Amino acid sequence: MSLSSERKVQVIKEHQCSVNDTGSPEVQVALLSERITQLSGHFKQHTHDHHSRQGLLRAVGQRRKLLDYLKKKDLDRYRTLINKLGLRR
């Protein structure tokens, strides 16, 4: 369950801070959010896929860590990101 290359490039372009930015917390959180959304849809049909569910929980935890880091370092960027992605916090 990975993102297609085209979708990944599109998400990176939407959230990057500069031209070659692929590793900023904003980009990483956006990619994880996209993957979490995709996996959540997968579980509507495949309710007993426990191995993928572990991957989902790992991705949610990683996103939480990145959001906590961003909140600690730059509160304005954090608030902008959660509003842009529509996350509850």
Curated annotation (Swiss-Prot):
The gene is rpsO. GO terms for biological process: translation. Pfam families: Ribosomal_S15. This is Small ribosomal subunit protein uS15. It comes from Nitrosococcus oceani (strain ATCC 19707 / BCRC 17464 / JCM 30415 / NCIMB 11848 / C-107). InterPro entries: Ribosomal_uS15, Ribosomal_uS15_bac-type, uS15_NS1_RNA-bd_sf. The keyword Ribonucleoprotein applies. One of the primary rRNA binding proteins, it binds directly to 16S rRNA where it helps nucleate assembly of the platform of the 30S subunit by binding and bridging several RNA helices of the 16S rRNA. Belongs to the universal ribosomal protein uS15 family. GO terms for molecular function: rRNA binding; structural constituent of ribosome. One of its GO terms (cellular component) is cytosolic small ribosomal subunit. HAMAP family: Ribosomal_uS15_B. Gene3D superfamilies: 6.10.250.3130, S15/NS1, RNA-binding.
